[in-house]
């Protein structure tokens, strides 16, 4: 299994946001019996594009290029995880932290928390997307650039 240090190496620095994604991944692994996703077995739909997403990429193997990391932007620290193998899913929503903390205090707080104490566990409300599809490419009549068929009108 990947480690916190793997997440830091990928992201470039330690921070509270990275910790959120790392701990969300650990909790999803526990709740859904997940393993690192070599292909599209694990799907994550993130409701933000903040630092925590990097932790999820490292820990679970979700990526935009593979089509198993998607964004449903709502500005929330919430992540829906899906196990295609078992058909199970969960939505983890970050609980509010104590008010008035500095960045350093927030980081220390999140580092000290158990994942179960950080997140509310809810049903995933976004339908599991279909597996990524490959599209033919065509030269666009307007610009002359090669474009995926799904974008040509």
Where on the chain are the PLM-derived regions?
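Long, charged N-terminal interaction/targeting segments
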Residues: 1-126
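Active-site helix-to-loop segments that bind/position phosphate- or nucleotide-bearing substrates
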Residues: 129
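Short metal-coordination and nucleic-acid-contact micro-motifs, chiefly zinc-binding Cys/His arrays
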Residues: 134-136
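Short cysteine-rich clusters marking metal-coordination/redox-active sites
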Residues: 140-144
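Short, non-ligating residues that shape and space the ligands of small metal-coordination modules
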Residues: 149-150
